[in-house]
């Protein structure tokens, strides 16, 4: 259900009913649950792979600019010249997050962003999202990630939306009190 909801709000699927509309100042970036389409059959290395997503950024034409973005996601040295088709699941997640950072979006939609990541990578993602000034819509089974990042919990269950301000622990406590 969550993946379907994200696909609908990102325009990849049509809703069965109802409508939604992003505001005119909203720019979105999407981290899909399945990112294989971005890597399968691709013969590019990391730097060149990232370059295909930067034509709108004039300063991104330099290798040092792209390496800096990849460095934020813990790619360094000769790792940036690895072919993307041989990357591990965690490395692909880190590439996708680097790609998202390039867009400068003010809304991020993340479907299970910590899947396949080691602790160091999860920490890097957490730190980046805590500093992010926009809106983050995400689904995750990683309770620590949810507790660290979420300040509003929305639960879609049986056709009903529950919306609560506060952390995940606050939300759980409210369920216990009922």
In which residue ranges do the predicted regions lie?
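ABC ATP-binding cassette signature C-motif
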Residues: 1-178
């Amino acid at each position: 259900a969550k993946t379907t909801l994200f696909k609908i709000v990102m325009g990849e699927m049509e809703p069965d009913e109802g409508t939604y509309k992003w505001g005119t100042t909203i720019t979105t970036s999407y981290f899909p649950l399945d990112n294989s389409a971005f890597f399968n059959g691709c013969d590019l290395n990391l730097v060149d792979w990232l370059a295909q997503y930067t034509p709108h950024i004039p300063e991104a034409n330099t290798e040092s600019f792209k390496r800096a973005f990849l460095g934020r996601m813990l790619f360094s040295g000769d790792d940036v010249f690895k072919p993307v088709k041989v990357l591990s699941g965690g490395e692909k997640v880190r590439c996708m997050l680097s790609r998202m950072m390039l867009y400068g979006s003010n809304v991020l939609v993340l479907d299970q962003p910590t899947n396949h990541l080691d602790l160091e990578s999860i920490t890097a993602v957490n730190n980046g999202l805590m500093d992010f000034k926009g809106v983050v819509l995400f689904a995750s089974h990683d309770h620590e990630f949810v507790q660290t990042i979420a300040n509003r919990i929305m639960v879609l269950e049986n056709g009903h939306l529950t919306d609560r301000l506060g952390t995940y622990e606050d939300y759980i406590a409210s369920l216990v009190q009922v």
